[in-house]
Swiss-Prot record:
Residue ranges constituting the LRRCT domain according to the UniProt record: 219-275
SMART domains in UniProt: IG, IGc2, LRR_TYP
Record note on quaternary structure: Binds AMIGO1 or AMIGO2.
Keyword Cytoplasm belongs to the record: no
Protein name: Amphoterin-induced protein 3
GO molecular function, one term: protein-containing complex binding
Taxon lineage: Eukaryota, Metazoa, Chordata, Craniata, Vertebrata
Lipid bilayer topology: Single-pass type I membrane protein
Disulfide bonds, paired cysteine numbers: 34-40, 38-47, 223-251, 225-273, 300-352
Role noted for this protein: May mediate heterophilic cell-cell interaction. May contribute to signal transduction through its intracellular domain.
Major subcellular location class: membrane
Transmembrane segment boundaries: 384-404
Gene Ontology annotations for the cellular component aspect, listed alphabetically: membrane
Gene3D superfamilies: Immunoglobulins, Ribonuclease Inhibitor
Length: 504
């Protein structure tokens, strides 16, 4: 019996050691149609740098971001994006595409980003970009574009960023923007092309938010006075497209490629432009002063009634009815813009864009709003309180006057003026001097006087032969009559007699 138990234990140990094949519990990993040598990660498909001359035949349907850059693609099949109904970004840069063709993007209605940069495209036809109604960013820089169809971008209603730099374009229509909607367009890069003629009135009529993102540097622009004044004003207003690339704005002084001069550094070329009128090129923006917490109303003033009105906020947000995403800005039925509670975020440039069949061209109106905090209001002046306070102070002063003891003046600290009740020492001195005086008064006064003045000499003063001298101590105290002494001396006023009383 024991050996059976040992045998069963040994068999269990052998089974555990051998294990079970993986194929029973875990099926082999599915490849999800991932092309050969490509990398598939969730909704990302990267086939970059593989030297592909054609697009892979099978692409995963869950792909949202497709990267086919740095290959050798020369053609794109019509409808090749039909299985990719979730596609949002397509990277076709650094290939050898020289043309697109009709229907290439017809099934990419959800595409947001299309990168066609660094190819060899020479033209864009009327239907090359059909089907891209949701496209927001189109990169076409570093190609060989020479011609753009008049309606090449007609179907791109949501396009906000268009990069056409580093091409060979000699002209561009700023009037209709080749079918683009100026309501959404925020960035238009036309730098490093061959633009030799630009309509200044068309430039001036563009919305302010598009001027801020219009890049025209490194083009052989003409040294035109009106164009110079316009770009100079943009530079002074701080538009980033001009301010950030001011050193790269050049113009041809003598219509020769070798005569390029820098717009903002060599102003001698435009010395004669001071008399050229620069007014009327742009409609001046209106400056508004708003206080935090107050309400603000902006109106889109147009020459004739407009069919459609849209606004662009300082944060580059397109505003249509009912208003902004956060609800702080409302667009009303008449096209006006209302802010119920102004905050610091509402400071900046608000642009109104009006379109309609009766308007010869799109009209814009600009408001430069500055937001300030309200000053604290001063407290109201309380006359009742001040009256009560004045009465209390007056009562205290009256009580002090009636019941407070008189001021005992110190001779050095307090100098109070009091009329003396007794004759002062100076008065006594004056009286004695008048008594001792030998000058007889006038005759009438002697007759009128019936009084006799008698002076008795002290016994100790008899040896002075009747001569007395008035002397004042060094520290003469005006308020101590005892400090005044009569001294004998040789200089007396007069000598009248010796011992005995003297009568005068």
């Amino acid at each position: 019996m024991t050996w059976l138990v040992l045998l069963g234990t040994l068999l269990c140990m052998l089974r555990v050691g051998l294990g079970t094949p993986d194929s029973e519990g875990f099926p082999p990993r599915a490849l999800h149609n991932c092309p050969y040598k490509c990398i598939c990660a969730a909704d990302l498909l990267s086939c970059t740098g593989l030297g592909l001359q054609d697009v892979p035949a099978e692409l995963p349907a869950a792909t949202a971001d497709l990267d086919l850059s740095h290959n050798a693609l020369q053609r794109l099949r019509p409808g090749w994006l039909a299985p990719l109904f979730q596609l949002r970004a397509l990277h076709l840069d650094h290939n050898e595409l020289d043309a697109l063709g009709r229907g290439v993007f017809v099934n990419a209605s959800g595409l947001r980003l299309l990168d066609l940069s660094s190819n060899t495209l020479r033209a864009l036809g009327r239907h090359d970009l059909d089907g891209l109604g949701a496209l927001e960013k189109l990169l076409l820089f570093n190609n060989r574009l020479v011609h753009l169809d008049e309606h090449a971008f007609h179907g791109l209603r949501a396009l906000s960023h268009l990069y056409l730099g580093c091409n060979e374009l000699a002209s561009f229509s700023f009037d209709h923007l080749h079918g683009l909607s100026a309501t959404h367009l925020l960035t238009l890069d036309l730098s490093s092309n061959r633009l030799g003629h630009i309509s200044v009135p068309e430039l001036a009529a563009l919305p302010a938010f598009l001027k801020n993102g219009l890049y025209l540097h490194n083009n052989p622009l003409p040294c035109d006075c009106r164009l110079y004044h316009l770009l100079q004003r943009w530079h002074q207003r701080g538009l980033s497209a001009v301010r950030d690339f001011a050193r790269e704005y050049v113009c041809l002084a003598f219509k020769v490629p070798a005569s390029r001069v820098r717009f903002f550094q060599h102003s001698r070329v435009f010395e004669n432009c001071s008399s050229a009128p620069a007014l009327g090129l742009e409609r001046p923006e209106e400056h508004l002063y708003a206080l935090v917490g107050r309400s603000l109303r902006l109106y889109c003033n147009t020459s004739v009634p407009a069919m459609r009105i849209a606004w662009v906020s300082p944060q580059q947000e397109l505003l249509r009815a009912p208003g902004s995403r956060d609800g702080s800005i409302a667009v009303l039925a008449d096209g006006s813009l209302a802010i119920g509670n102004v905050q610091e975020q509402h400071a900046g440039l608000f642009v109104c864009l009006a379109t309609g069949p009766r308007l010869h061209h799109n009209q814009t109106h600009e408001y430069n709003v500055s937001v300030h905090f309200p000053r604290p209001e001063p407290e109201a002046f309380n006359t009742g309180f001040t009256t009560l306070l004045g009465c209390a102070v007056g009562l205290v002063l009256v009580l002090l006057y009636l019941f407070a003891p008189p001021c005992r003046c110190c001779r050095r600290a307090c100098r109070c003026r009091r009329w003396p009740q007794t004759p002062s020492p100076l008065q006594e001195l004056s009286a004695q001097s008048s008594v001792l005086s030998t000058t007889p008064p006038d005759a009438p006064s002697r007759k009128a006087s019936v009084h006799k003045h008698v002076v008795f000499l002290e016994p100790g003063r008899r040896g002075l032969n009747g001569r007395v001298q008035l002397a004042v101590a060094e520290e003469f105290d005006l308020y101590n009559p005892g400090g005044l002494q009569l001294k004998a001396g040789s200089e007396s006023a007069s000598s009248i007699g010796s011992e005995g009383p003297m009568t005068t």
